[in-house]
């Protein structure tokens, strides 16, 4: 019998080169609240977090660049979604 997979452990081996000067994902100031709620549930890295006051906070550091939020939120919740500039972004390390 195999042991269950711990997603946090698997994500922990990835390396992230964060471009502090140029975020590759920008949330709209007037983002659709329902879409933000969907992104909280859909983001596999858990980067959209619901706060105690009901607002949603996002941090692009740690992004897996899967495109889930692009598909669900571009135009309604996201102002911009593009891949990080060269040498930046996620470096997958299978461990």
Curated annotation (Swiss-Prot):
InterPro entries the UniProt entry points to: Fd_FixX
Family matches, as SUPFAM superfamilies: 4Fe-4S ferredoxins
Keyword line: 4Fe-4S, Electron transport, Iron, Iron-sulfur, Metal-binding, Transport
Entry's Gene Ontology molecular function annotations: 4 iron, 4 sulfur cluster binding; iron ion binding
Domain of life per record: Bacteria
Family: Belongs to the bacterial-type ferredoxin family. FixX subfamily.
Role, per record: Could be part of an electron transfer system required for anaerobic carnitine reduction. Could be a 3Fe-4S cluster-containing protein.
Record's protein name: Ferredoxin-like protein FixX
Species in which this protein is naturally found: Shigella flexneri
